[in-house]
């Protein structure tokens, strides 16, 4: 089939209600007080998307945003998917980075793609589940546009997947709060139109 085009808009959640320097990933942190202002900016960025399929991480910093954006775009409902959750930092969740022994953190940062924090998951684990979601989305919803509200780790993994980048390189991609990244799939070819807008 020719001419089938699908746009996938990856939206990072807005600023979370957490102090600077705190390690968080899978912890279900709420949105910050700036949510309404950030939401207004995002609504402008995505106003042109008509009735997309909307998917979200189940964490409230994403699902709250997804519900608002879905209503704004006349989307029927939001489908949450656990595979869109942020990296699980295990025992480090909600600890100050400064309080985690430096040697342990350095060991992890040297190979955080394959190494997992204690009782957490590695970036390869995250990439595996994000890729699985992406492949399903492409095959099941061909030709439909999708809005995916998720986390920086997942967005970087999906950009890596779309561009065939090594995961270590993907970690250099800047993904700001409330930013939009657009992936186009046309006639089976995947391209990244823009990142972090």
Give names to the regions the model predicted:
Residues 2-6, 75, 79, 87-99, ...:
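Acidic, low-complexity terminal tails and accessory targeting/binding regions
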Residues 68, 157-161:
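Active-site signature of alpha/beta-hydrolase-fold catalytic machinery across serine-
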Residues 8, 52, 144-153:
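Generic beta-sheet signal
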Residues 5-14, 100-107:
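Short coil-to-beta-strand
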Residues 16, 154-155:
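Short active-site segment of divalent metal-dependent hydrolases/proteases
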Residues 41-105:
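Phosphate-coordination/substrate-recognition cap region in phosphate-metabolizing enzymes
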Residues 10-65, 117-131:
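Loop-to-helix element that buttresses phosphate recognition and phosphoryl-transfer chemistry
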């Amino acid at each position: 089939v020719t001419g089938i085009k699908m746009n996938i808009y990856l939206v990072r959640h807005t600023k979370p209600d957490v102090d600077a320097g705190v390690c968080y990933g899978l912890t279900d942190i709420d949105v910050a007080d700036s949510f309404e202002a950030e939401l207004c900016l995002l609504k402008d960025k995505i106003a042109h998307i008509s009735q997309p399929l909307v998917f979200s991480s189940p964490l409230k910093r994403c699902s709250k945003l997804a519900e608002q954006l879905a209503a704004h775009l006349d989307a029927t409902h939001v489908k949450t998917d656990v595979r869109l959750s942020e990296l699980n930092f295990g025992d480090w969740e909600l600890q100050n980075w400064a309080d985690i022994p430096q040697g342990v953190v350095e060991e992890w940062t040297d190979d955080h793609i394959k190494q997992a924090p204690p009782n957490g998951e590695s970036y390869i684990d995250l990439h595996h589940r994000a890729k699985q979601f992406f492949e399903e989305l492409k095959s099941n919803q061909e030709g439909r546009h999708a809005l995916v509200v998720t986390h920086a780790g997942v967005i970087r993994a999906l950009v890596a997947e779309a561009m065939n980048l090594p995961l270590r390189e993907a970690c250099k991609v800047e993904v700001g709060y409330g930013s939009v990244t657009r992936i186009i799939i046309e006639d089976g070819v995947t391209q990244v139109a823009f990142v972090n807008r």
